[in-house]
UniProtKB/Swiss-Prot annotation:
Pfam families: Piwi. This is Protein argonaute. PAZ domain is absent, but Ago is capable of binding small RNAs in the same way as the other Argonaute proteins. Residues 436-760 form the Piwi domain. Belongs to the argonaute family. Ago subfamily. GO terms for biological process: cell differentiation; regulation of translation; regulatory ncRNA-mediated gene silencing. Gene3D superfamilies: 3.40.50.2300, paz domain, Ribonuclease H-like superfamily/Ribonuclease H. The keyword Chaperone does not apply. It comes from Giardia intestinalis. It comes from the Eukaryota.
Amino acid sequence: MRNNIAGPPITPVQATVKVTRVRQMDPTDLMSMKILLNILLRRTFESSLGMLNIRSGFYDLRNPSIHAIQIDGRGYDICWIPGFRLTTATLRGKLGLQILPETTKVRSKSMNELLTERRGNIHPSALAVITVMAMHNGKVFRVHSIVQGQTIVSPLANGNETDYFTYYSTRYRDKIDSAGLSLLRHNDYCNSVMQQDKFILKLTPLKRTQNGKVVRPCNVPSSLCIIISDNEIAPYGVSKLSTNRAAVALSTMSPDALLEKATAFAARLAEDTELQSLLGDYGFGFTSNPLELETFVCKPPKLMMDNTSRIVTIEDDSGGVFHNLLQSPGVSPIYYSNNNQPATGMPVWAIMVPRNLGNDYARRLRKELTERVRSLAGTTAPNIGDPPLIAVELSNQRREMYRVEPYKDAFKALLNKLRLEYKDARESEIVAKIQLVVIVIPGPKQDRGDLYKGIKQFYTHMGIVTQCLLAPKSSQNELQWYDQAVLRSVCQQIYAKAGGAVWAPVLPPQNVYSKSTMLCALDISRPKKTVGRPAEVPISTAGFISTYDGSFEYIYSQKKTLVPNRLNHGGELQQQTLMEAFIKNSCNVYLAFNNRILPDHIVIFRDGVSDSQISATLEVEIKSLYECLRQIYHKSNRPMCDLKVIVAQKTCAMRFSAVGGTVLRSGYYVINRSPDNRQQGSEFLMASQAIVHGTTPKPIRYKIIFDSMEASVDNDSFNQLIELTNAMAYGYVNWPQAISLPHVLHMAHHLSKFCGEVLRNGDDLFESCAIFGLQYRPFFI
């Protein structure tokens, strides 16, 4: 086992590829595919104890490193050039690795200054990089970007922008600047890279700034690739995309359109006599027709989703490279309605839109929301009904616009519309049939606070889940439509609130906590101190979240209002009773969904507990909780479970410094190796980003304050517990927001804050029959 805080390794490291975070994206979108690949490479290389962040350069910069990576049980060599970083690329429809100069990480100098220092003099008005892709054993592609000495200038654009590019070939290595090849250090390594005489030539428009730096213009959407093979150059497609509108437009083009655009670009190059003369000296010629190569495909890989097995497979023309790595959103078979009976789908839901937004906006919103939610539902899409449109009569006066009464009147109109369909049903039965209501409210955010709270209070106390959506901004008497990422996030929340499983963590099956485990989280929301009222004690709200299935996708929520007590008389008894009630209800729910079998492992995450409060928490809450669980398991004739209580502390004053000028990988670090976790507590720290020069942003400190098994830090169970925490904190699929805490603790925070600040501490969820069904759905997000 490698030491966590030692310097960077220089020996080969065995690593396992594992997906830790994936977002829902369009399979045909090249930009989305690039985002997916970046996510795969950012956090997928794990060693035995932590993350192996290849992108941040966690290697010896003086020597080349070759690391064996296991992908689906097959080994591949990933070659890394010192001073370069790994990114992603696609070739022949497969996933690949791309290496680009890591100048910003290696030293704080511009590309121009670095190359001038490394290579001597460069072209006075040009700077370029070549991307070389080579196939290894027919499976994995290694892509290298090498700065070369020969720079060819082709004035193809007007103004200050000029296309600069270079090329490389093993046949003419002696004609290339030897200083550029010195970056590779070893000729044997260079020969192993250039096994095939097929290369990608990347042409990037560059321009020189006033201070002499050469940069890529912001308005350049992409770089077009050209294939060099058998002394011919042919178009390939889009190589690099940025986030501007022109690039996004290119990313949505069909493969035929991309190939046509690349062909036109190659035709422009073929007409340049100066360029042909320069390349002719090296034996290369131009052709405007695509090469007849079956292995080169101008299209991205496809994401194939299996709704039954809940697995996404990345396929290509030759059968695929990465299989069974991603979990799809899937379909939720169970959620509870008010009559305590399981239901499937979302047959009854509605959309409320202010009338002043117009009919065109309302119809387009209904169409897009319905199509996106049905795409998430998979095979159960027919169970997603067509939502009726309900007009909300809002006043044009700004003061009257943010009143909740028009939305209450719109709900009455919805009930009247549903009475025509359910003529013999009572009003309470009709209300129970409504799964969700999408409500469009006027902006801006700073003005809609009371309206939002009023809507949530009105609908939640009736047991109806709502999804609020801000009205779009108007520009030149036209409404600006929503960003696609916003609509995608809204639809995922709608599907989750209806009972679907959208956010799933990725945990290896060999981890002991992947089976028969119940995760719990407790968070207490305390409102801001009341100014000018020192005698008042603010009311606090406790939110408790527990999981009841093996994949940790479905949650059961509980809420309790803590009685204010200035002298804390009976406060310890209140906390003790609170935890016992929470855990009893959670165990009953777990029994109902798991064939009357209790979990073998229970992991409880706590937030808001400082070091000075740990001893009191152990004496007051944990001991009584442990005895309560022993009684529950004794009645069920089951052995006592493995109980662990972990405190997450967001305010962490620890600092890490990079060792020897290197970069510490992101992941987790074991701080305290205590053999007795119940008495002293083992600690580990998680950081979401690599530690470069000193500190890391917002590290989370985890302290195991209770462990019924008393596992030491060297035990496999402890390492698997860290892996579980890491998966819950960073491994959730499709979560639209940033997560730094474990997901159950994140949800408990949302629950306590929503009930305390929005619902204003109304009826407790597990004491109110009217909103019993909401406990199984994340209505509070």
